[in-house]
Curated annotation (Swiss-Prot):
Residues 318-587 are annotated as: Protoheme IX prenyltransferase. This is Protoheme IX farnesyltransferase. It comes from Chloroflexus aurantiacus (strain ATCC 29366 / DSM 635 / J-10-fl). Converts heme B (protoheme IX) to heme O by substitution of the vinyl group on carbon 2 of heme B porphyrin ring with a hydroxyethyl farnesyl side group. The chain crosses the membrane at residues 9-29, 58-78, 93-113, 123-143, 172-192, 195-215, 238-258, 260-280, 315-335, 337-357, 386-406, 409-429, 437-457, 464-484, 522-542, 560-580. InterPro entries: COX15/CtaA_fam (IPR003780), Protohaem_IX_farnesylTrfase (IPR006369), UbiA_prenyltransferase (IPR000537), UbiA_prenylTrfase_CS (IPR030470), UbiA_sf (IPR044878). Carbon 2 of the heme B porphyrin ring is defined according to the Fischer nomenclature. Residues 1-317 are annotated as: Unknown.
Length: 587
């Protein structure tokens, strides 16, 4: 089949799936889902009733039928095409499976199956099919280059950062779309109200990442001779991402019709970010770096950037993910929008303050390590005293914010985390024993306690389990990094496990602690806090983690070690995301 015909079929299927999503939202808003008592048609109601809601319901079912045919036609076309072997066939099959599931869920709703389960799958299945279709189209439209570009130095770093940001933006948009879609089954939030806080938070996070990616793409991307015409428009096309994100966010505050606006905008944003991510992953670009321009950065911007870097934003991002997701899985129900905002502000200030104090205390170590020697304090751009005072100010502000706007217990745990990391770990533990990572893991495991107590004001068994998951996740994650950077640690005199016990013992300990962590990750199900949805996610994610840990132990090369280190970051975020999904869907 010709490439143009194949693409036309796939685009028609994508458009019909979007029409299915929009018409389905219209059915829910108008409360016309119950006017038809039969499936797939409702001819009796159509003949006997003059109710216009019947036509809305029938229109939705028509779009479902047309989209189902188009999706499976696209699947057949992709499999018959000789140019689409591999990943596009898989994603096309996933799209067809999800769409079939959502169609069956719609039938179950009419037949009287428990509405919560069927309703979630009905809309979520369509959204997941839409995402898989978008990925299929992007993979076919943007083929892998025969000779991948070779970048080095700062340009390669920029490329990795922008690619990672693009995929995170796509993931965030997908979560936001599912959050909006699931709101109809959240107790206390009917479809005739504005979007509840969980959806607003998800949309806001997706909007933030999308805007960031759009700005970075416009600022950094430079086309080269091999850049195809489709990708040349990416820097300009990226401006539509903030517009879609803003539209999705604004729709969250408009009753009734706002749901339709938000759902449409976030679905389009999801498709757009997926396409952008594939383009950035596969298309050759050059990247403008800080040294490429003739204009130097103003002094005040450099100072601000240095102080921000003291807070270690990359490290903080994962801490805030665990804090945020924890807030949505407590037994207290969904937190308010303002509680989420103030907890995130307080959490950033606490983690940032501890990070700045760490930079002040560790400057003698950082200067001897290639990974950290260019930080502001060891390089002399900021004095140790200034870094310490800055960290102290942020820490005090964090306690005030959390105490005033959340709960005293959340402020207490934030203070405990600051002392644990900035003084106990940095000042003594890190320099004294190879068990620094094991014991020090408690510092990184405190953010879920902050999020939990900010919502509930108390600590429960589930909060302790969340602490334990991160506590046992920390050793395999950081020991993998220590294996890669063991020469730096040896030169700086830091007794990390690879320096003290060698590579073989470190690889074995990584496997052992990985197994413990995966076992601990199943405890939420054992104590009755989570259900089968989280169980499936935890098992799948855990098996992948154990596979990578096994590769580190048996093979032990740099590729295996880096693979585990990078996946461990994604693993932790996805495990907590699976808990949120379980709580929102099952309750």
């Amino acid at each position: 089949m010709a490439a143009r015909s194949l693409m036309r079929i796939l685009l028609v299927g994508l458009g019909l799936t979007l029409a299915t999503i929009i018409s389905g939202a219209l059915v829910t808003i108008s409360a016309s889902a119950t006017v038809c008592s039969s499936w797939p048609l409702c001819l009796e109601e159509l003949v006997q009733s003059q109710n216009p809601l019947v036509w809305i319901s029938l229109l939705h079912r028509l779009f479902v039928a047309l989209a189902l045919l188009a999706v499976f036609a696209g699947l057949v076309a992709v499999w018959r095409s000789s140019d689409t072997a591999g990943l596009p066939r898989i994603t096309a099959g996933i799209a067809a499976a999800f769409f079939l599931l959502q169609a069956l869920a719609g039938a179950l709703l009419v037949w009287g199956v428990p509405a919560m389960v069927a309703d979630v799958w009905h809309l979520s299945g369509a959204l997941l099919a839409f995402g898989a279709q978008s990925l299929t189209i992007a993979l076919i439209a943007v083929p892998t280059p025969a000779t991948p570009e070779r970048l080095a130095g700062r340009a390669a770093q920029m490329q990795r950062r922008l690619r990672s940001l693009a995929w995170w933006s796509a993931a965030a948009a997908g979560v936001a779309a599912l959050a909006i879609g699931a709101r109809s089954v959240v107790p206390g939030f009917g479809m005739m109200t504005a979007v509840p806080t969980n959806s607003v938070s998800a949309v806001g996070f997706a909007a933030l990442l999308s805007v960031w990616m759009a700005l970075e793409a416009r600022r950094r991307l430079r086309p080269v001779a091999e850049t195809p015409a489709l990708a040349l428009a990416l820097p300009r096309y990226s401006l539509f991402l903030p517009a879609l994100a803003l539209l999705a966010l604004l729709g969250a505050f408009i009753p009734v019709a706002g749901h339709l606006i938000s759902l449409t905008a976030i679905a389009l944003l999801w498709a757009a970010t997926i396409i952008a991510a594939v383009i950035l992953q596969r298309v050759p670009f050059s990247f403008a770096t800080a040294t490429a321009g003739v204009r130097s950065q103003p002094a005040w911007r450099t100072v601000v950037a240095d102080y921000i870097s003291l807070t270690k934003p990359k490290v903080i991002s994962l801490l805030l993910v665990t804090t945020l997701t924890t807030m949505f899985i407590t037994e207290a129900g969904l937190p308010s929008w303002w509680l989420v905002i103030w907890t995130m502000i307080g959490g950033y200030l606490a983690a940032g303050g501890a990070g700045a104090i760490n930079c002040a205390f560790d400057s003698d170590i950082d200067i001897n390590m290639g990974r950290t020697s260019r930080r502001p304090v060891p390089s002399g751009r900021i004095s140790r005293r200034a870094a310490f005072i800055f960290g102290l100010i942020l820490s005090v502000l964090s306690i005030i914010v959390l105490w005033v706007f959340t709960t005293p217990l959340a402020a207490f745990f934030a203070l405990l985390g600051i002392i644990y990391y900035a003084w106990f770990y940095t000042g003594w533990l890190k320099r004294s024993t190879w068990q620094n990572i094991i014991i020090g893991g408690g510092a990184g495991a405190i953010p879920p306690l902050v999020g939990w107590t900010a919502v509930t004001g108390s600590v429960s068994l589930m909060a302790v389990v969340l602490f334990a998951i991160i506590f046992y996740w920390t050793p395999p994650h950081f020991w993998a990094l220590a294996l890669v950077k063991q020469k730096d640690y040896a030169r700086a005199g830091v007794p990390m496990l690879p320096v003290v016990a060698g590579e073989a013992e470190t690889r074995w300990q990584i496997l052992v602690y990985s197994a413990i962590m995966v076992a601990v990750s199943l405890l939420p199900v054992a104590i009755g806090a989570m259900s089968w949805i989280y169980l499936i996610g935890a098992v799948v994610l855990g098996l992948r983690f154990m596979r990578d840990a096994w590769a580190v132990w048996r093979v032990g090369d740099q590729a295996a070690i880096w693979g585990l280190y990078k996946y461990s970051l994604l693993y932790l975020a996805l495990v907590f995301a699976a808990m949120v999904a379980d709580r929102l869907i099952i309750g």
